[in-house]
């Protein structure tokens, strides 16, 4: 799952739990401005490649911890979504952490 796929599945589940007939699109797009939430970390200025990769690493590390926790929850559907997302996010964490180490080592 990419981030859009993860969000879509979580919002679909939220709509089912809510029980008011709203699908993922209704939950995602049809709300007041103050109801929108996001991770402020990803709003930081891009900066150079090192800044970008460190920010990506921090985001990936948080995502892995979140999905690990949700993968062991009692709600079967949420647990399944989290397990699938965790697999992909571990790949992203490995990729970004390799870049952080590479950039941290510098050049000779």
Language-model-detected regions and their locations in the chain:
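Conserved alpha-helical segments that form or flank metal/cofactor-binding pockets of metalloenzymes
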Residues: 2-30, 96-101
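Amphipathic, well-ordered alpha-helical segments in soluble domains
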Residues: 6, 10, 59-66, 92-96
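Acidic/His metal-coordination segments adjacent to aromatic residues that form catalytic metal sites
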Residues: 30-56, 103-107
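Alpha-helical bundle segments that constitute or directly flank the non-heme di-iron/ferroxidase center
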Residues: 1, 45-73
